[in-house]
Amino acid sequence: MHDKDVVFTAGPGGRMQGDIRVPGDKSISHRSVMLGSLAEGVTEVSGFLQAEDCLATMAAFRAMGVEIEGPTEGRLRIHGVGLHGLKPPAAPLDLGNSGTSMRLLSGLLAGQAFDTTLTGDASLVRRPMRRVTEPLRAMGARIDTTEAGTAPLRIAGGSRLKGIDYAMPVASAQVKSCLLLAGLYAEGKTCVTEPAPTRDHTERMLAGFGYPVARDGNRVCIQSGGKLSATRIDVPADISSAAFFMIGAAISPGSDVFLRHVGINPTRTGVIEILREMGADIEILAPREVGGEPVADLRIRYRELRGIRIPEHTVPLAIDEFPALFIAAACATGETVLTGAEELRVKESDRIQAMADGLTTLGIDARPTPDGMVIRGGSFRGGAVDSRGDHRIAMSFSIAALRAPIPIEIHDCANVATSFPNFVELARTLGLDIEVS
Protein backbone atom coordinates (compact mmCIF):
# COMPACT_ATOMS: atom_id res chain seq x y z
CA MET A 1 0.00 0.00 0.00
CA HIS A 2 1.21 3.51 -0.71
CA ASP A 3 1.40 5.71 2.40
CA LYS A 4 2.03 9.11 0.83
CA ASP A 5 -0.96 11.03 -0.53
CA VAL A 6 -0.07 11.55 -4.18
CA VAL A 7 -2.15 14.44 -5.55
CA PHE A 8 -2.92 15.10 -9.22
CA THR A 9 -3.88 18.68 -10.11
CA ALA A 10 -5.42 18.73 -13.58
CA GLY A 11 -6.63 21.42 -15.98
CA PRO A 12 -8.47 23.57 -16.38
CA GLY A 13 -9.70 23.21 -19.95
CA GLY A 14 -7.72 22.39 -23.06
CA ARG A 15 -7.98 19.80 -25.78
CA MET A 16 -6.23 16.54 -26.64
CA GLN A 17 -4.19 16.12 -29.80
CA GLY A 18 -1.48 13.65 -30.76
CA ASP A 19 -0.48 10.15 -31.77
CA ILE A 20 0.56 7.69 -29.04
CA ARG A 21 0.69 4.02 -28.06
CA VAL A 22 -0.54 3.36 -24.52
CA PRO A 23 1.14 0.59 -22.47
CA GLY A 24 0.45 -3.12 -22.84
CA ASP A 25 -2.79 -4.79 -21.87
CA LYS A 26 -2.90 -5.68 -18.18
CA SER A 27 -5.07 -8.80 -18.54
CA ILE A 28 -2.88 -10.25 -21.29
CA SER A 29 0.36 -9.34 -19.45
CA HIS A 30 -0.75 -11.24 -16.31
CA ARG A 31 -1.75 -14.30 -18.30
CA SER A 32 1.46 -14.32 -20.37
CA VAL A 33 3.50 -14.73 -17.17
CA MET A 34 1.19 -17.39 -15.72
CA LEU A 35 0.99 -19.59 -18.81
CA GLY A 36 4.60 -18.93 -19.84
CA SER A 37 5.71 -20.16 -16.40
CA LEU A 38 3.68 -23.38 -16.75
CA ALA A 39 4.78 -24.01 -20.34
CA GLU A 40 7.67 -26.19 -21.51
CA GLY A 41 10.42 -24.10 -23.08
CA VAL A 42 11.20 -20.38 -23.18
CA THR A 43 8.34 -17.95 -23.83
CA GLU A 44 9.25 -14.51 -25.17
CA VAL A 45 6.91 -11.61 -24.42
CA SER A 46 7.00 -8.10 -25.91
CA GLY A 47 4.75 -5.18 -24.95
CA PHE A 48 4.51 -6.44 -21.33
CA LEU A 49 2.91 -3.91 -18.97
CA GLN A 50 5.57 -2.91 -16.43
CA ALA A 51 3.02 -1.85 -13.81
CA GLU A 52 2.77 -2.92 -10.18
CA ASP A 53 -0.07 -5.43 -10.68
CA CYS A 54 1.73 -7.37 -13.41
CA LEU A 55 5.05 -7.16 -11.57
CA ALA A 56 3.29 -8.73 -8.55
CA THR A 57 2.31 -11.71 -10.72
CA MET A 58 5.89 -11.97 -11.99
CA ALA A 59 7.30 -11.84 -8.44
CA ALA A 60 4.93 -14.63 -7.37
CA PHE A 61 6.22 -16.98 -10.08
CA ARG A 62 9.83 -16.09 -9.34
CA ALA A 63 9.09 -16.98 -5.71
CA MET A 64 7.93 -20.39 -6.99
CA GLY A 65 11.19 -21.05 -8.80
CA VAL A 66 10.52 -19.72 -12.30
CA GLU A 67 13.41 -17.90 -13.98
CA ILE A 68 12.13 -14.74 -15.70
CA GLU A 69 14.51 -12.39 -17.52
CA GLY A 70 13.41 -8.74 -17.69
CA PRO A 71 11.28 -6.77 -17.98
CA THR A 72 13.43 -4.61 -20.24
CA GLU A 73 11.39 -2.15 -22.33
CA GLY A 74 8.41 -4.49 -22.11
CA ARG A 75 10.37 -7.63 -23.04
CA LEU A 76 10.42 -10.82 -20.95
CA ARG A 77 11.98 -14.25 -21.37
CA ILE A 78 10.15 -16.79 -19.22
CA HIS A 79 11.87 -20.13 -18.65
CA GLY A 80 8.83 -22.37 -18.24
CA VAL A 81 8.92 -25.19 -15.69
CA GLY A 82 5.97 -27.20 -17.05
CA LEU A 83 2.61 -27.76 -15.38
CA HIS A 84 4.15 -29.65 -12.45
CA GLY A 85 7.44 -27.79 -12.03
CA LEU A 86 6.53 -24.99 -9.60
CA LYS A 87 8.30 -25.06 -6.21
CA PRO A 88 6.84 -24.11 -2.81
CA PRO A 89 7.36 -20.39 -2.04
CA ALA A 90 9.28 -19.59 1.14
CA ALA A 91 6.71 -17.02 2.29
CA PRO A 92 3.14 -15.87 1.57
CA LEU A 93 2.72 -14.44 -1.95
CA ASP A 94 1.91 -10.72 -1.63
CA LEU A 95 -0.08 -9.67 -4.69
CA GLY A 96 -0.35 -5.98 -3.82
CA ASN A 97 -3.49 -4.40 -5.30
CA SER A 98 -4.05 -7.07 -7.96
CA GLY A 99 -7.40 -8.88 -7.88
CA THR A 100 -6.57 -10.61 -11.16
CA SER A 101 -3.40 -12.12 -9.70
CA MET A 102 -5.19 -13.38 -6.59
CA ARG A 103 -8.23 -14.87 -8.31
CA LEU A 104 -6.34 -16.56 -11.15
CA LEU A 105 -3.54 -17.85 -8.92
CA SER A 106 -6.06 -19.35 -6.49
CA GLY A 107 -7.20 -21.71 -9.27
CA LEU A 108 -3.72 -22.47 -10.55
CA LEU A 109 -2.37 -23.15 -7.04
CA ALA A 110 -5.34 -25.26 -5.87
CA GLY A 111 -3.90 -28.15 -7.90
CA GLN A 112 -0.29 -27.97 -6.68
CA ALA A 113 1.37 -30.42 -4.30
CA PHE A 114 2.46 -27.65 -1.88
CA ASP A 115 0.68 -25.20 0.44
CA THR A 116 0.50 -21.50 -0.43
CA THR A 117 -0.89 -18.34 1.14
CA LEU A 118 -2.06 -15.41 -0.99
CA THR A 119 -2.34 -11.94 0.50
CA GLY A 120 -2.31 -8.32 -0.66
CA ASP A 121 -2.73 -4.67 0.26
CA ALA A 122 -5.53 -3.14 2.37
CA SER A 123 -7.83 -2.82 -0.67
CA LEU A 124 -7.25 -6.34 -2.00
CA VAL A 125 -7.87 -8.07 1.33
CA ARG A 126 -11.34 -6.45 1.41
CA ARG A 127 -12.40 -7.73 -2.02
CA PRO A 128 -14.80 -10.71 -2.29
CA MET A 129 -13.11 -14.07 -2.89
CA ARG A 130 -15.99 -16.51 -2.25
CA ARG A 131 -16.82 -16.28 -5.94
CA VAL A 132 -13.64 -18.30 -6.59
CA THR A 133 -13.26 -20.27 -3.36
CA GLU A 134 -16.76 -21.82 -3.50
CA PRO A 135 -16.47 -23.42 -6.97
CA LEU A 136 -12.84 -24.41 -6.23
CA ARG A 137 -14.00 -26.20 -3.06
CA ALA A 138 -16.65 -27.96 -5.16
CA MET A 139 -13.73 -29.27 -7.27
CA GLY A 140 -12.06 -30.62 -4.13
CA ALA A 141 -9.72 -27.74 -3.27
CA ARG A 142 -9.00 -26.96 0.38
CA ILE A 143 -8.89 -23.18 0.83
CA ASP A 144 -9.31 -21.13 4.00
CA THR A 145 -10.33 -17.46 3.99
CA THR A 146 -11.35 -14.97 6.67
CA GLU A 147 -14.91 -15.30 8.02
CA ALA A 148 -15.91 -12.58 5.56
CA GLY A 149 -14.69 -14.75 2.67
CA THR A 150 -11.75 -12.44 1.94
CA ALA A 151 -7.95 -12.88 1.73
CA PRO A 152 -5.54 -14.05 3.03
CA LEU A 153 -6.29 -17.26 1.10
CA ARG A 154 -4.61 -20.34 2.55
CA ILE A 155 -4.49 -23.04 -0.11
CA ALA A 156 -3.62 -26.59 0.99
CA GLY A 157 -1.47 -28.59 -1.39
CA GLY A 158 -2.02 -32.19 -2.41
CA SER A 159 -5.77 -31.90 -3.08
CA ARG A 160 -7.13 -34.18 -5.81
CA LEU A 161 -9.25 -31.89 -7.95
CA LYS A 162 -12.16 -33.20 -9.98
CA GLY A 163 -13.57 -31.48 -13.06
CA ILE A 164 -16.72 -29.43 -12.55
CA ASP A 165 -19.57 -28.18 -14.72
CA TYR A 166 -20.13 -24.72 -13.28
CA ALA A 167 -22.72 -22.11 -14.19
CA MET A 168 -21.41 -18.73 -13.01
CA PRO A 169 -24.04 -16.64 -11.19
CA VAL A 170 -22.32 -13.38 -12.21
CA ALA A 171 -20.36 -12.80 -15.43
CA SER A 172 -16.69 -12.65 -14.36
CA ALA A 173 -13.64 -13.33 -16.50
CA GLN A 174 -11.56 -13.76 -13.35
CA VAL A 175 -13.78 -16.55 -12.01
CA LYS A 176 -13.93 -18.26 -15.41
CA SER A 177 -10.13 -18.06 -15.79
CA CYS A 178 -9.55 -19.29 -12.24
CA LEU A 179 -11.62 -22.43 -12.88
CA LEU A 180 -10.02 -23.09 -16.28
CA LEU A 181 -6.56 -22.89 -14.69
CA ALA A 182 -7.70 -25.27 -11.92
CA GLY A 183 -9.05 -27.48 -14.72
CA LEU A 184 -5.49 -27.98 -16.00
CA TYR A 185 -4.95 -30.02 -12.80
CA ALA A 186 -8.41 -31.58 -12.31
CA GLU A 187 -9.42 -35.13 -13.16
CA GLY A 188 -11.60 -35.16 -16.28
CA LYS A 189 -13.27 -32.18 -17.88
CA THR A 190 -13.96 -28.74 -16.41
CA CYS A 191 -16.69 -26.62 -18.01
CA VAL A 192 -17.78 -23.07 -17.21
CA THR A 193 -20.98 -21.45 -18.46
CA GLU A 194 -21.22 -17.67 -18.24
CA PRO A 195 -24.47 -15.65 -18.10
CA ALA A 196 -23.00 -13.00 -20.42
CA PRO A 197 -19.79 -12.87 -22.47
CA THR A 198 -16.65 -11.78 -20.59
CA ARG A 199 -13.08 -11.24 -21.72
CA ASP A 200 -11.68 -14.40 -23.26
CA HIS A 201 -7.94 -13.76 -23.09
CA THR A 202 -7.32 -16.94 -21.07
CA GLU A 203 -9.02 -19.18 -23.66
CA ARG A 204 -7.22 -17.48 -26.56
CA MET A 205 -3.85 -17.71 -24.83
CA LEU A 206 -4.27 -21.36 -23.79
CA ALA A 207 -4.89 -22.13 -27.46
CA GLY A 208 -1.82 -20.03 -28.36
CA PHE A 209 0.26 -22.24 -26.04
CA GLY A 210 -1.12 -25.30 -27.85
CA TYR A 211 -3.60 -26.36 -25.15
CA PRO A 212 -6.99 -27.44 -26.54
CA VAL A 213 -9.99 -25.43 -25.32
CA ALA A 214 -13.53 -26.25 -26.45
CA ARG A 215 -15.88 -23.27 -26.83
CA ASP A 216 -19.58 -23.55 -27.58
CA GLY A 217 -21.51 -20.30 -27.26
CA ASN A 218 -21.30 -19.14 -23.65
CA ARG A 219 -19.74 -22.41 -22.44
CA VAL A 220 -16.03 -23.22 -22.36
CA CYS A 221 -14.46 -26.58 -21.45
CA ILE A 222 -10.94 -27.82 -20.77
CA GLN A 223 -9.64 -31.35 -20.23
CA SER A 224 -6.63 -32.08 -18.03
CA GLY A 225 -3.67 -34.10 -19.24
CA GLY A 226 -2.33 -31.76 -21.92
CA LYS A 227 0.75 -29.57 -21.90
CA LEU A 228 1.60 -25.95 -22.67
CA SER A 229 4.32 -25.31 -25.26
CA ALA A 230 6.35 -22.08 -25.12
CA THR A 231 5.42 -19.39 -27.63
CA ARG A 232 5.95 -15.72 -28.50
CA ILE A 233 3.46 -13.14 -27.23
CA ASP A 234 3.11 -9.55 -28.47
CA VAL A 235 0.89 -7.78 -25.93
CA PRO A 236 -1.36 -5.17 -27.58
CA ALA A 237 -1.98 -1.75 -26.01
CA ASP A 238 -4.59 -1.85 -23.23
CA ILE A 239 -8.03 -0.61 -24.32
CA SER A 240 -8.81 0.12 -20.65
CA SER A 241 -5.88 2.57 -20.55
CA ALA A 242 -6.68 3.92 -24.02
CA ALA A 243 -10.23 4.64 -22.80
CA PHE A 244 -9.12 7.65 -20.74
CA PHE A 245 -7.73 9.35 -23.84
CA MET A 246 -10.63 8.23 -26.04
CA ILE A 247 -12.99 9.95 -23.62
CA GLY A 248 -10.70 12.95 -23.12
CA ALA A 249 -10.78 13.54 -26.88
CA ALA A 250 -14.52 12.84 -27.13
CA ILE A 251 -15.41 15.54 -24.54
CA SER A 252 -13.00 18.39 -25.38
CA PRO A 253 -13.69 20.60 -28.44
CA GLY A 254 -10.88 20.66 -31.01
CA SER A 255 -9.49 17.26 -29.99
CA ASP A 256 -8.08 14.71 -32.44
CA VAL A 257 -6.24 11.70 -30.97
CA PHE A 258 -4.66 8.67 -32.68
CA LEU A 259 -4.09 5.59 -30.48
CA ARG A 260 -1.89 2.85 -31.96
CA HIS A 261 -1.99 -0.96 -31.73
CA VAL A 262 -4.94 -1.11 -29.31
CA GLY A 263 -6.37 -4.52 -28.43
CA ILE A 264 -9.96 -4.63 -29.70
CA ASN A 265 -10.92 -8.09 -28.46
CA PRO A 266 -14.74 -8.13 -28.86
CA THR A 267 -15.10 -9.02 -25.17
CA ARG A 268 -13.45 -5.67 -24.29
CA THR A 269 -14.93 -3.17 -26.76
CA GLY A 270 -18.01 -2.18 -24.79
CA VAL A 271 -16.43 1.25 -24.26
CA ILE A 272 -16.35 1.87 -28.03
CA GLU A 273 -19.93 0.64 -28.45
CA ILE A 274 -21.22 2.84 -25.61
CA LEU A 275 -19.34 5.96 -26.78
CA ARG A 276 -20.56 5.51 -30.36
CA GLU A 277 -24.12 5.15 -29.07
CA MET A 278 -23.58 8.51 -27.30
CA GLY A 279 -22.53 10.02 -30.64
CA ALA A 280 -18.73 9.89 -30.33
CA ASP A 281 -16.59 10.09 -33.49
CA ILE A 282 -14.40 6.94 -33.29
CA GLU A 283 -12.70 5.34 -36.28
CA ILE A 284 -11.26 1.81 -36.14
CA LEU A 285 -8.34 1.73 -38.59
CA ALA A 286 -6.15 -1.09 -39.95
CA PRO A 287 -7.76 -3.94 -37.98
CA ARG A 288 -5.42 -6.94 -37.78
CA GLU A 289 -4.71 -10.00 -35.66
CA VAL A 290 -1.56 -10.33 -33.54
CA GLY A 291 -0.94 -13.60 -31.71
CA GLY A 292 -4.61 -14.55 -31.65
CA GLU A 293 -5.78 -11.14 -30.41
CA PRO A 294 -7.52 -8.55 -32.63
CA VAL A 295 -5.70 -5.19 -32.75
CA ALA A 296 -6.38 -1.85 -34.49
CA ASP A 297 -5.48 1.84 -34.49
CA LEU A 298 -8.16 4.18 -33.14
CA ARG A 299 -8.83 7.80 -34.13
CA ILE A 300 -11.10 9.86 -31.87
CA ARG A 301 -12.27 13.39 -32.61
CA TYR A 302 -14.48 15.67 -30.56
CA ARG A 303 -18.19 15.55 -31.21
CA GLU A 304 -21.00 16.55 -28.87
CA LEU A 305 -22.27 13.59 -26.84
CA ARG A 306 -25.85 12.75 -25.85
CA GLY A 307 -27.10 10.87 -22.79
CA ILE A 308 -28.28 7.28 -23.30
CA ARG A 309 -29.62 4.27 -21.43
CA ILE A 310 -26.53 2.04 -21.46
CA PRO A 311 -27.41 -1.41 -22.89
CA GLU A 312 -26.97 -4.03 -20.14
CA HIS A 313 -25.26 -6.47 -22.53
CA THR A 314 -22.33 -4.03 -22.73
CA VAL A 315 -21.75 -3.98 -18.95
CA PRO A 316 -19.31 -6.96 -18.73
CA LEU A 317 -17.64 -5.72 -21.94
CA ALA A 318 -16.86 -2.31 -20.37
CA ILE A 319 -16.72 -3.09 -16.65
CA ASP A 320 -13.35 -1.37 -16.08
CA GLU A 321 -14.18 1.66 -18.23
CA PHE A 322 -17.25 2.90 -16.35
CA PRO A 323 -15.43 5.44 -14.17
CA ALA A 324 -14.23 7.16 -17.37
CA LEU A 325 -17.61 6.65 -19.09
CA PHE A 326 -19.28 8.45 -16.16
CA ILE A 327 -17.15 11.48 -17.09
CA ALA A 328 -18.41 11.22 -20.68
CA ALA A 329 -21.98 11.04 -19.34
CA ALA A 330 -21.40 14.17 -17.24
CA CYS A 331 -20.38 16.02 -20.43
CA ALA A 332 -23.31 14.73 -22.52
CA THR A 333 -26.60 16.48 -23.23
CA GLY A 334 -29.42 14.84 -21.27
CA GLU A 335 -29.50 11.86 -18.96
CA THR A 336 -27.39 8.70 -18.96
CA VAL A 337 -28.69 5.66 -17.07
CA LEU A 338 -26.57 2.64 -16.11
CA THR A 339 -28.17 -0.52 -14.64
CA GLY A 340 -26.95 -4.09 -14.10
CA ALA A 341 -23.49 -3.02 -12.90
CA GLU A 342 -23.53 -3.93 -9.19
CA GLU A 343 -20.08 -5.50 -9.79
CA LEU A 344 -18.68 -1.93 -9.74
CA ARG A 345 -19.33 -1.79 -5.99
CA VAL A 346 -16.69 -4.47 -5.26
CA LYS A 347 -13.80 -3.25 -7.42
CA GLU A 348 -10.66 -1.55 -5.99
CA SER A 349 -13.21 0.79 -4.39
CA ASP A 350 -17.00 1.07 -4.53
CA ARG A 351 -16.76 2.73 -7.93
CA ILE A 352 -20.44 3.70 -8.06
CA GLN A 353 -20.35 5.60 -4.76
CA ALA A 354 -16.86 7.04 -5.25
CA MET A 355 -17.69 8.41 -8.72
CA ALA A 356 -21.11 9.71 -7.63
CA ASP A 357 -19.51 11.54 -4.69
CA GLY A 358 -16.78 13.05 -6.87
CA LEU A 359 -19.17 14.10 -9.65
CA THR A 360 -21.50 15.71 -7.10
CA THR A 361 -18.56 17.63 -5.58
CA LEU A 362 -17.77 18.91 -9.08
CA GLY A 363 -21.33 20.16 -9.62
CA ILE A 364 -22.81 17.27 -11.62
CA ASP A 365 -26.20 15.71 -10.83
CA ALA A 366 -25.16 12.07 -10.26
CA ARG A 367 -27.50 9.71 -8.40
CA PRO A 368 -26.11 6.30 -7.40
CA THR A 369 -28.42 3.27 -7.49
CA PRO A 370 -27.76 -0.23 -6.10
CA ASP A 371 -26.64 -1.47 -9.53
CA GLY A 372 -25.58 1.66 -11.39
CA MET A 373 -26.02 5.41 -11.71
CA VAL A 374 -28.19 8.12 -13.23
CA ILE A 375 -26.15 11.10 -14.48
CA ARG A 376 -27.58 14.31 -15.89
CA GLY A 377 -25.10 16.09 -18.14
CA GLY A 378 -24.02 19.51 -16.92
CA SER A 379 -21.04 21.79 -16.36
CA PHE A 380 -18.13 20.87 -14.14
CA ARG A 381 -16.86 23.27 -11.58
CA GLY A 382 -13.38 22.75 -10.17
CA GLY A 383 -12.72 21.32 -6.73
CA ALA A 384 -11.05 18.53 -4.79
CA VAL A 385 -12.08 14.87 -5.07
CA ASP A 386 -10.88 11.68 -3.39
CA SER A 387 -9.97 8.76 -5.66
CA ARG A 388 -10.14 6.36 -2.66
CA GLY A 389 -6.86 4.83 -3.78
CA ASP A 390 -8.52 3.60 -6.98
CA HIS A 391 -6.33 4.06 -10.07
CA ARG A 392 -9.22 4.25 -12.55
CA ILE A 393 -11.07 6.89 -10.54
CA ALA A 394 -7.92 9.02 -10.27
CA MET A 395 -7.37 8.94 -14.04
CA SER A 396 -11.05 9.56 -14.83
CA PHE A 397 -11.24 12.77 -12.81
CA SER A 398 -7.96 13.93 -14.39
CA ILE A 399 -9.66 13.77 -17.81
CA ALA A 400 -12.73 15.62 -16.46
CA ALA A 401 -10.51 18.68 -15.98
CA LEU A 402 -10.58 19.22 -19.76
CA ARG A 403 -14.11 20.55 -19.24
CA ALA A 404 -13.59 22.36 -15.92
CA PRO A 405 -13.25 26.17 -15.55
CA ILE A 406 -10.73 25.86 -12.69
CA PRO A 407 -8.38 22.99 -11.78
CA ILE A 408 -9.54 19.67 -10.32
CA GLU A 409 -7.44 18.32 -7.46
CA ILE A 410 -7.50 14.52 -7.11
CA HIS A 411 -6.22 12.92 -3.90
CA ASP A 412 -4.80 9.43 -3.22
CA CYS A 413 -3.48 8.77 -6.75
CA ALA A 414 -0.43 6.58 -6.00
CA ASN A 415 -2.20 3.44 -7.23
CA VAL A 416 -2.24 4.74 -10.81
CA ALA A 417 1.11 2.91 -10.91
CA THR A 418 -0.75 -0.42 -10.58
CA SER A 419 -2.07 -0.22 -14.15
CA PHE A 420 -0.69 2.81 -16.01
CA PRO A 421 2.68 4.04 -14.67
CA ASN A 422 3.23 6.62 -17.46
CA PHE A 423 -0.33 8.00 -17.48
CA VAL A 424 0.74 11.53 -16.49
CA GLU A 425 3.52 11.64 -19.08
CA LEU A 426 1.24 10.50 -21.94
CA ALA A 427 -1.62 12.77 -20.80
CA ARG A 428 0.78 15.74 -20.97
CA THR A 429 1.95 14.63 -24.44
CA LEU A 430 -1.66 14.87 -25.62
CA GLY A 431 -2.16 18.30 -24.04
CA LEU A 432 -3.64 17.73 -20.58
CA ASP A 433 -2.24 20.16 -18.02
CA ILE A 434 -1.52 17.86 -15.06
CA GLU A 435 0.82 18.25 -12.09
CA VAL A 436 1.78 15.66 -9.47
CA SER A 437 2.57 16.54 -5.85
From Swiss-Prot:
Its main location: cytoplasm. It catalyses: 3-phosphoshikimate + phosphoenolpyruvate = 5-O-(1-carboxyvinyl)-3-phosphoshikimate + phosphate. Pathway: Metabolic intermediate biosynthesis; chorismate biosynthesis; chorismate from D-erythrose 4-phosphate and phosphoenolpyruvate: step 6/7. GO terms for molecular function: 3-phosphoshikimate 1-carboxyvinyltransferase activity. It is found in: Cytoplasm. One of its GO terms (biological process) is aromatic amino acid family biosynthetic process. Catalyzes the transfer of the enolpyruvyl moiety of phosphoenolpyruvate (PEP) to the 5-hydroxyl of shikimate-3-phosphate (S3P) to produce enolpyruvyl shikimate-3-phosphate and inorganic phosphate. Its EC number is 2.5.1.19. One of its GO terms (cellular component) is cytoplasm. 3-phosphoshikimate binds at residues 26-27, 31, 172, 174, 320, 347. The keyword Transmembrane helix does not apply. The keyword RNA-binding does not apply. It is an enzyme of class 2 (transferase). This is 3-phosphoshikimate 1-carboxyvinyltransferase. CDD domains: EPSP_synthase. PROSITE patterns: EPSP_SYNTHASE_1, EPSP_SYNTHASE_2. Monomer. The active site is at residue 320.
